[in-house]
Every structure is written in C-alpha cells, then in structure tokens.
C-alpha cells in the first residue's frame, strides 16, 4: 500500500519537509516512489504537484493526517472529487 507522507529534510532546528508517495513498509527517510510536494512550516509555504497527487490518490494512496490537512487546505480534494465524478 502507498501513503502520501512527509519526509524530513533541511538543517537542525530548521526542518522542511517533502511530501512523497512512499510504500507503507518503508522508513520515514526511506526510498520514495515519487516526490509530489514541498512544505516549509516555518515560512508556511507549500508547493504541490497536483497532477501527481491526484494520480496517487486515484490509485488508492492514503495521506497521513498532516498531509491530509495540507492537501485539504490547498483544495486538492475538491479536484479529486471532480475527477471521480468524471470517471463514473
């Protein structure tokens, strides 16, 4: 199973996170399948690869709690529901 998860990078006391699609059995810093975004909590900046995120959500990937909140704030789930309606 694939999850959309935060992967920590950056310096000590200056963490930034990549939003990655990763196998559920992998470690937090393990090998990811795809980098789909970037989140900087200090400057409150977010960069998202919306088509990549939608691709993994359509394939059944589950976002973690924090990633879910980030995606919800960015409005990704409204686009996801629109894509689901078009397919059905």
From Swiss-Prot:
As for subcellular location, the record says: Plastid, Chloroplast
- Species of provenance: Oenothera elata subsp. hookeri (Hooker's evening primrose)
Location (main, coarse) = plastid
- Keywords noted in UniProt: Chloroplast, Plastid, Ribonucleoprotein, Ribosomal protein
Protein name in UniProt = Small ribosomal subunit protein bS16c
Q: What Gene3D superfamilies would the database entry show?
A: 3.30.1320.10
Please name the NCBIfam families in this protein's record: S16 (TIGR00002)
Which superkingdom? Eukaryota
Spell out the GO cellular component terms annotated for this protein, sorted alphabetically and separated by semicolons: chloroplast; mitochondrion; small ribosomal subunit
One GO biological-process annotation of the entry reads: mitochondrial translation
Family under the similarity heading: Belongs to the bacterial ribosomal protein bS16 family.
InterPro entries tied to this protein: Ribosomal_bS16 (IPR000307), Ribosomal_bS16_CS (IPR020592), Ribosomal_bS16_dom_sf (IPR023803)
The entry lists its GO molecular-function terms as:
structural constituent of ribosome
